[in-house]
Amino acid sequence: MNRSRRDALLLGLASAGAVAGPSGAAAAPRTTAPPCPAPSPTWRTGLEGQRRGDLGDGTYLNPVLSGDRPDPGVFKDGEDYYAVFTSFHYYPGAVIWRSRDLVNWTPVGPALDRPLGSVWAMDIAKHDGRYFIYIPVLVAPDGRAEGLPFKIYVVHAASMAGPWSPPIDMGIDGHIDPGHAVGEDGKRYLFLNDGHRVRISDDGLSRAGEVEKVYDGWPIPEDWVIEAPAPEGPKILRRGGWFYLFSGQGGTAGPPTSHMVVVARSRSIHGPWENCPHNPIVRTAGKAEPWWSRGHATPVQGPAGDWWLVYHGYENGFRTLGRQTLLEPFDWTSDDWPKARGGVLAGPLPKPVPKSRESHGLALSDILRRDRLGIGLQFHDPQPGYLDRARFTPDGLVLAGQGTGPADASPLAFVAGDRAYEVTVDLEIVGAAMGGLLLFYDDKLFCGLGAEPEALHAYKTGSAQSYPSPGPAVGRRLSLRVVNDENVATFFVRAADAPWRKAVSYEVAGYNHNMADGFVSLRPALFAAGDGELVFRKLTYRALQPPG
């Protein structure tokens, strides 16, 4: 049976029979909220109660991959589909996911463990029997885009399961969002942001020409509310004598109506490019829609020969979850233009394979393992040699301290895709270390608890807070819990085998890109700082269902 959010908030407190607040008084029970004006979508539950897009009746409800899975680059290889998503400063990164039906996805593993910088939107390609992932990297030290110091790297392998080559600098600087294509001339190209293109070598590993402007984008009406014109995320599809160029425009964040999917086509890879007469084929038209800033699409043919768009969007009211992966069917018109037919994605849609019974997702309670590093826990902005900090034993994860606190400790974070969830972890402090449990956006914005043997620290908006106090220290062996109830985060603490005690609560809806930049998401995270180690044992994740 799934626990409700109300149950979870009171779980640690009910162990003691009462809730002790700062004054020692018992806390009042949570009151029942008034009914919402409209019912929320109902997802099927999967591992640990995580929401699952496959409804089990031949239909699906977006997102197909919940949580921060932005800028999907999708590739069909026989009966398999593979996807990569922007991984930013998280390493091991460039995690590959696999599907047979475009709805259910499971992780394969990371293709990149060497820290290069902030990894942005990638593309996957297969050429002459070999696999390639093209990786744009922002090399600015703070991961933000001032000056756009980008480089494009490539890794390659004989199999999508790896092993992957070390990253190779292609000599293409100042551009992002590579989209691989092969022209009618048999030559290989990367299409880039802002309508640019560059020819690459026959082996796909280096630049073989100059970057040139080939497409001006679709002219967005002046009265539309967008973030910026920003042509980006180019993907090339060759079909029926045409090359189709799918692009994102309008800006990936900002107002809800910003992002969109536009299409152009040409008889030649060299242009000229003709814009689709019914652009944009996908766009959030108003702030009442369930998915905001929809864009950055990859077109892909489904198992039955039909056509689909895989793209990202923000969930209305839950920007903290990041840009999630959405799936929408599209048709071809009589004059060979794509036309999306999913509407605003408010309800279920027929699955590409109605009777498929594929597995989906990742058990987050099982990520304290070496073989889950990258697909589960990832280091944020790690230093060289970062993998040596983590030792995995039958007892759990032993993490060496780094820095003085969460901001410079390179926390280990993981993606959570549920509107409400709880995370619990048992830990032991070894030596002169300190560490704990966070909700982590980046090294400047986080909240949570950190413990030393003689002190308990609370963090809010990226810094330690002294009021209200999180309470007294609880020793070297303790447990921490966070309940994130639709962007209201409550942290609990207990000494070994003692009752739970509520420490602090925060409202965290503002921990998102539109407030803090960076394009990332709010993630549960573990950290260890100081001179010593933290032993993390028995991490448990559980999605929480609405009361009722």
Q: What positions do the PLM features span?
A:
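Carbohydrate-active catalytic/glycan-binding domains of CAZyme proteins
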Residues: 1-2, 10-13, 28-548
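N-terminal export signals
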Residues: 7-27
